[in-house]
């Protein structure tokens, strides 16, 4: 909701009851994952405050339990640590922090690029490169060369997208809507989630399967849905920071089409519902085949989409009057 004086406006939200109704499957390893994440943050102190650690560990452990509910306990922890690392890096070095000191973000990005290129172990005094080095070594041991390289490439894309986002976050009106729609799947981490899911769930598409139009269309629909849902859920929190409007779908739709914020939310919500219908159709089509890597991929994408729908109800994404942590991804 938004406030104008004493008036309260409820912003319209998309309805997913026909496409991704809850309750969603949940891993039995959520509590163990939460404990492991807290211990991992002791080894790699990525966040400065106990509150920030608590909020991020909570949403990450509960979120991954819905993202990959069939993963085994150790693989779920590995996936959770990767997602926590990405989110913590964005919270600490991306978005508004980066807009104030873009040079520092570029320097941090250079450090991570060296790690992704297979450089020497970074010192533990620099927790983000050190933690990334640890994660990459464990993923490399877990999978084959092709899957590992896809994961590393997706991480590079995500990190570079965060630099792009930081460059534009203070003046979102300068960003073309089409460019934003192409970049958003990278800044919301969903392409990295796709790559990690194949490793964690122990399946791998062939190049021919990956090139199939139904697979590409389904991946695009889920990737779009993830970013757009997140934009609607986090808009109020980001707008409360001011003075610029958030670099997000409602802002750019309003710039393109005019009208009120409520109209922009309604338009974005319609886009979400349409993309959810495309995703559901693709999942139903692929998952109905005999068990194979394609059916495993369809089920994985279904759970990933469900997890983004679930995330919107977490305190991290609630408005400022409801006590959310000052983060937005």
Curated annotation (Swiss-Prot):
Sample GO molecular function, one term: metal ion binding
Coiled-coil stretches noted in the UniProt entry, renumbered to this chain: none
Motif DDXXXE motif location, chain numbering: 90-95
Binding positions for Mg(2+) 3 per the UniProt entry: 230, 234, 238
Catalytic activity, reaction form: (+)-copalyl diphosphate = (12E)-labda-8(17),12,14-triene + diphosphate
Binding site for Mg(2+) 2: 95
InterPro entries referenced in this protein's UniProt entry, alphabetically: Isoprenoid_synthase_dom_sf, Terpene_cyclase-like_2
Cofactor note: Binds 3 Mg(2+) ions per subunit.
Motif (NXXXSXXXE motif): 230-238
Domain comment in the entry: The Asp-Asp-Xaa-Xaa-Xaa-Glu (DDXXXE) and Asn-Xaa-Xaa-Xaa-Ser-Xaa-Xaa-Xaa-Glu (NSE) motifs are important for the catalytic activity, presumably through binding to Mg(2+).
Assigned protein family: Belongs to the terpene synthase family.
Protein name: (12E)-labda-8(17),12,14-triene synthase
Annotated organism of origin: Streptomyces cyslabdanicus
Taxonomic classification: Bacteria, Bacillati, Actinomycetota, Actinomycetes, Kitasatosporales
Gene that produces this protein: cldD
């Amino acid at each position: 909701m938004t406030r104008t004086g004493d008036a309260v406006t409820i912003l319209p939200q998309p309805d997913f009851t026909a496409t991704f109704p809850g309750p969603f499957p949940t891993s039995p390893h959520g509590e163990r994952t939460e404990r492991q994440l807290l211990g991992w943050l002791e080894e790699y102190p990525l966040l400065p405050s106990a509150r920030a650690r608590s909020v991020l560990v909570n949403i990450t452990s509960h979120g991954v339990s819905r993202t990959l509910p069939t993963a085994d306990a150790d693989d779920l922890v590995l996936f959770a640590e990767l997602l926590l690392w990405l989110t913590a890096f964005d919270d600490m070095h991306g978005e508004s922090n980066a807009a104030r000191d873009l040079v520092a973000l570029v320097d941090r990005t250079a450090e991570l690029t060296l790690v992704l290129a297979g450089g020497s172990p970074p010192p533990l005094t620099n927790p983000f490169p050190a933690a990334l080095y640890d994660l990459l070594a464990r993923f490399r041991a877990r999978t084959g060369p092709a899957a590992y390289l896809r994961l590393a490439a997706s991480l590079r894309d995500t990190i570079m997208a965060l630099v792009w986002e930081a460059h534009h976050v203070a003046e979102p009106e300068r960003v073309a809507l089409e460019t934003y729609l192409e970049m958003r799947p990278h800044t919301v981490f969903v392409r990295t989630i796709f790559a990690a899911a194949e490793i964690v769930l122990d399946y791998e598409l062939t190049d021919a399967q990956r090139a199939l139009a139904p697979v590409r269309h389904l991946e695009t629909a889920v990737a779009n849905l993830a970013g757009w849902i997140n934009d609607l859920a986090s808009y109020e929190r980001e707008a409360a920071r001011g003075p610029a409007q958030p670099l997000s779908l409602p802002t750019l739709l309003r710039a393109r089409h005019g009208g009120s914020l409520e109209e922009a939310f309604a338009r974005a919500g319609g886009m979400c519902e349409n993309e959810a219908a495309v995703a559901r159709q693709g999942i139903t089509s692929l998952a109905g085949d005999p068990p194979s890597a394609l059916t495993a991929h369809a089920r994985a994408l279904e759970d990933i989409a469900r997890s983004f729908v679930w995330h919107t109800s977490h305190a991290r994404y609630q408005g400022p009057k409801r006590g959310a942590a000052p983060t937005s991804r």
